[in-house]
Amino acid sequence: MLEELECGAPGARGAATAMDCKDRPAFPVKKLIQARLPFKRLNLVPKGKADDMSDDQGTSVQSKSPDLEASLDTLENNCHVGSDIDFRPKLVNGKGPLDNFLRNRIETSIGQSTVIIDLTEDSNEQPDSLVDHNKLNSEASPSREAINGQREDTGDQQGLLKAIQNDKLAFPGETLSDIPCKTEEEGVGCGGAGRRGDSQECSPRSCPELTSGPRMCPRKEQDSWSEAGGILFKGKVPMVVLQDILAVRPPQIKSLPATPQGKNMTPESEVLESFPEEDSVLSHSSLSSPSSTSSPEGPPAPPKQHSSTSPFPTSTPLRRITKKFVKGSTEKNKLRLQRDQERLGKQLKLRAEREEKEKLKEEAKRAKEEAKKKKEEEKELKEKERREKREKDEKEKAEKQRLKEERRKERQEALEAKLEEKRKKEEEKRLREEEKRIKAEKAEITRFFQKPKTPQAPKTLAGSCGKFAPFEIKEHMVLAPRRRTAFHPDLCSQLDQLLQQQSGEFSFLKDLKGRQPLRSGPTHVSTRNADIFNSDVVIVERGKGDGVPERRKFGRMKLLQFCENHRPAYWGTWNKKTALIRARDPWAQDTKLLDYEVDSDEEWEEEEPGESLSHSEGDDDDDMGEDEDEDDGFFVPHGYLSEDEGVTEECADPENHKVRQKLKAKEWDEFLAKGKRFRVLQPVKIGCVWAADRDCAGDDLKVLQQFAACFLETLPAQEEQTPKASKRERRDEQILAQLLPLLHGNVNGSKVIIREFQEHCRRGLLSNHTGSPRSPSTTYLHTPTPSEDAAIPSKSRLKRLISENSVYEKRPDFRMCWYVHPQVLQSFQQEHLPVPCQWSYVTSVPSAPKEDSGSVPSTGPSQGTPISLKRKSAGSMCITQFMKKRRHDGQIGAEDMDGFQADTEEEEEEEGDCMIVDVPDAAEVQAPCGAASGAGGGVGVDTGKATLTASPLGAS
């Protein structure tokens, strides 16, 4: 009788499942009730048959199949080995690991005719060969794998897996006949039996020959058979072992190969129809073991000794098992096996998932470590690269610094060399200047006497020339003679004779035909004579340089230039003549003279820019100055004075000396700026001229007459010098008295005032007595003659009087204009002069600016000017009229005197006088009139190297 074990069947599988019960939370608690009495077995056999069963068991001990006992021992040994490996002895609810190890004794009496019936086959025919068995065995494994994939997780995976692995027992692959097999599992089974306390002996077992002859079972086929829970499995397929009740046939029946449970199974009716009796299918010995092991309370079977050979009994008592019972047991086994397979599949799946997770964790951990390691390597690599780059940058920086230091040293050395060279040049230049200065000082002894300036010759006007109007004859112009031939007295007397002795014999027509016209040379005007009279030195032109060609010989200079060419134009001579290019054919080509195929513009190459001459510009200037000095010869520049040269007691003031030096230097610079070159003056040597040879040496006489000795008149007595000085002072007083009305309050410049005053004097519009003497005590020692009154004062005298007696400044009363000093106005009794002045102009004067027109009071028609002159002068006003700077009292300068227009013309020296004026302080200027005349500064007048006393006009 087969039944499903709730907690675990005894045997190999029961041992595995019993140890797993404690770890399975899914199983109910009621299934553990049977474990409380481990040694009590339930006897499912009726009491009436107990004796029979004991007898049957006693008889079946000798008739047991050796192969089944070996398989069971192997199963138990495998279970013990697996349990020892997988479990530890623990007590749960008083139940130990040996409680579920129930010894299963299968007491079956297998007769000579033993038949193994596979309930899954369609017929009970015996297979002819072993091929079907191997095929079914191979088909069982995929079905098992398919079932394992669908199991559920209901318990401990490890314990169940070990139990399933221990269920595999070694069974013959071909038949169940008693074949002598000697395997390693027997030793294991012996060991397992010893552990359970069984007294089985490990000895080789002999299987009786059920087939044609004895065969050795291979190890692989033995492993395919197993027993679990009293059910015999081949692989994973349960097998049922039947015995023939009749025992008629000889025991030469081959075992049928088993097929998996998963395949198509035939109904049990078809299986049982092959036997003579339907009710007697299984023997009592084949089912005694399952029935006895199904009850945990039944007593364990005593251990038995197995011999190597066991003869089959001729007759074995059998027990009837119904088909319904067999079918139920089979279904239960199938369900249990399916559940075990599902559970095992789930456990395997969970284990695979766990292993996969662990594998993934390991891989993630390994990947993380690799990433960390890689990151560290990258970090180290970057640090190494950064360190190498920093070292490289430091090396480059050090190299650059070294190169920079070397370049700096080179520049410093070059600069020092240049400075040394410049210092040497300056030293050489200083030595040359010193030599020149020494030469110039020595040359002062041999200096030529300079001729004083002569007044310009008056303009000469040609007389009436018929229909031509009179015209001016300039210095370089000469009137042509009216008669080319010279008039001789002989020719004149001959003409008179011919006129007196006229006769008709001579024909005038014949005379005209045969007479030859007279010839005369060109009218030549000698320019040398004019130069000789104007200068005491004859200027001799130096010969032309060797490199200058003669124009007459080489012809005119020509310019060949084209706008589309980059090549510079040609400037020079072109003397080649051609016979092909003419005026009528200007575009003809002369291939003999010119090559028209060559483009000279393409061959032109621009010159590379030269080196910088910033350091040598001063040298060039020095060279130019040296050249000019060489051209000047032994003459020193204008204004150059040696030590103590030209210094007199009157000129001892260093400030005035500096001012004069600056003025002369400025004049010299302006003269050089005009681009005038100097010519070397060479002396002309003229020998003695005798009185007899005057006609021959007429030109030389004219030159020498300029230096002829003349007798000077005897100088007057010393007393006569004082009236002469007084005369000049009186003339200045007279001019100043007439100038005051025009000067005081005038907004125009000194040039306009001087020109207007001279024009008035030229027209005779000024009265002789417009002013009074400076003081009552002053008396005229000499009455001016009409010629003196009619004489026009010079510009220099008028300018001197204006600068001495007035100042050009801005005062609260009026804007910038000329203000005469109060003491001067008081001395001439003209304090009432208006500001601005009321003067009737006879010349055109510039109009006043618009911004100041409002502050200027009306001056009547005398101050008005034409509108055209106003418009014309408004656009050319000087910027100095907008200057609002207040001058200090007593400060007189050239700019203050000139007003709107600066006087840049040179002052003409009148009568060779040179006056040095000492300007008093402001306190002296504002002194009373009486004190002013006595405290006036001294004025030195150099007239023929004579020093005169000061006059009251000297004080300002």
Swiss-Prot record:
What family does this chain come from, according to its entry? Belongs to the CHAF1A family.
| Disulfide bridges in this chain | none
What is the protein's major site of localization? nucleus
Q: Phosphothreonine (modified residue): where?
A: 722, 865
The record places the cross-link (Glycyl lysine isopeptide (Lys-Gly) (interchain with G-Cter in SUMO1)) at: 182
Give residue spans, biased composition: Polar residues: 56-65, 767-786, 855-866
Question: What organism, scientifically named, is this protein from?
Answer: Homo sapiens (Human)
Question: Which gene produces this protein?
Answer: CHAF1A
Describe what happens upon changing residue 242 to E: Abolishes interaction with CBX5
Covalent cross-link Glycyl lysine isopeptide (Lys-Gly) (interchain with G-Cter in SUMO2) as placed by the record, residue numbers: 182
Query: PANTHER family, from UniProt?
Result: CHROMATIN ASSEMBLY FACTOR 1 SUBUNIT A, CHROMATIN ASSEMBLY FACTOR 1 SUBUNIT A CAF-1 SUBUNIT A
Protein name from the UniProt record: Chromatin assembly factor 1 subunit A
Q: Where is the composition biased (Acidic residues)?
A: 599-610, 618-633
